[in-house]
Curated annotation (Swiss-Prot):
LRR repeats lie at residues 94-117, 119-140, 141-165, 167-190. The lineage of its organism: Eukaryota, Viridiplantae, Streptophyta, Embryophyta, Tracheophyta. Induction: Up-regulated by methyl jasmonate. InterPro entries: LRR_dom_sf, LRR_N_plant-typ, LRR_R13L4/SHOC2-like. Residues 1-27 form the signal peptide. Pfam families: LRR_14 (PF23598), LRRNT_2 (PF08263). It comes from Arabidopsis thaliana. Keywords: Leucine-rich repeat, Plant defense, Repeat, Signal. Gene3D superfamilies: Ribonuclease Inhibitor. Disulfide bonds: none annotated. This is Leucine-rich repeat protein 1. Involved in plant defense response.
C-alpha cells in the first residue's frame, strides 16, 4: 500500500513538473515574439527597457498584461515615441486580445501574420507611418471589435474579408490613400462615412456603383 501511494505521489509530482515546464516553454515563446518586436523598434525613451529576454516570464515586463495562466493578453505601447517596423512574430501571441501601438512613428507594412491572432479584440495602429495594404488575413480575426488604422499611408482596397467579422463595431481607416469602394454589408452597414474620409481615391458607398478604378486598385 505504501509503495502504491509513493508511486502515485511520484506520478503527481512528475505531472506537476511537466505542466510547469509546458507553461515555461509557452511563456518563453511569447517572450521571444515580444523581444522580436523590441528588436524591430527604435526606442529613444527606453519604454521597452524592462523587456529582458533573460527573464523567464514576459508577464513581468512593463506594458505587457497577462491572464491568470501567464499568457500575454495585452501589449500597450500607444504614444511611446517608437519608430521602426512591426515584427511578424507578433502573430505567435495566440492569446493576445489588445494590440495598442497607436501614435508612434512605426513604418513599413502591417504583417499578414497578425491574422493569426484569433482572440484579438482591438487592433489600434492609428497615427503611425504605415504603408502597404490592409492585409486580407485580418478577416480571420473573428473576435475583433475595434480596428483603427487611420492616419497612416496605407494603400489598396478595403478587404472584403472584413465584412465577415460579426463582432466588428468600430472601423476607422480615414486619412490614408486607400482606393476602390467602401463596403456596406455586414458590420460596415453601421460604420459612419467619416471613418473613411481623406482617402482621395476611395469611392463609396459601393451601392452607388463600382468606381472606375475598382478593378485596378493598388
Amino acid at each position: 500500500m505504501a509503495s502504491r501511494n509513493y508511486r502515485w505521489e511520484l506520478f503527481a509530482a512528475s505531472l506537476t513538473l511537466t505542466l510547469a515546464l509546458i507553461h515555461l516553454v509557452e511563456a518563453n515563446s511569447e517572450g521571444d515574439a515580444l523581444y522580436a518586436l523590441r528588436r524591430s523598434l527604435t526606442d529613444p525613451d527606453h519604454v521597452l527597457q524592462s523587456w529582458d529576454p533573460t527573464l523567464v516570464n514576459p508577464c513581468t515586463w512593463f506594458h505587457v498584461t497577462c491572464n491568470q495562466d501567464n499568457r500575454v493578453t495585452r501589449v500597450d505601447l500607444g504614444n511611446s515615441n517608437l519608430s521602426g517596423h512591426l515584427a511578424p512574430e507578433l502573430g505567435k501571441l495566440e492569446h493576445l486580445q489588445y494590440l495598442e501601438l497607436y501614435k508612434n512613428n512605426i513604418q513599413g507594412t502591417i504583417p499578414s501574420e497578425l491574422g493569426n491572432l484569433k482572440n484579438l479584440i482591438s487592433l489600434d495602429l492609428y497615427n503611425n507611418n504605415l504603408t502597404g495594404i490592409v492585409p486580407t488575413s485580418l478577416g480571420k480575426l473573428k473576435s475583433l471589435v475595434f480596428l483603427r488604422l487611420n492616419d497612416n499611408r496605407l494603400t489598396g482596397p478595403i478587404p472584403r474579408a472584413l465584412t465577415a467579422i460579426p463582432s466588428l463595431k468600430v472601423v476607422d481607416v480615414s486619412s490614408n490613400d486607400l482606393c476602390g469602394t467602401i463596403p456596406t454589408n455586414g458590420p460596415f452597414a453601421h460604420i459612419p462615412l467619416q471613418n473613411f474620409e481623406n482617402n482621395p481615391r476611395l469611392e463609396g458607398p459601393e451601392l452607388l456603383g463600382l468606381a472606375s478604378y475598382d478593378t485596378n486598385c493598388t
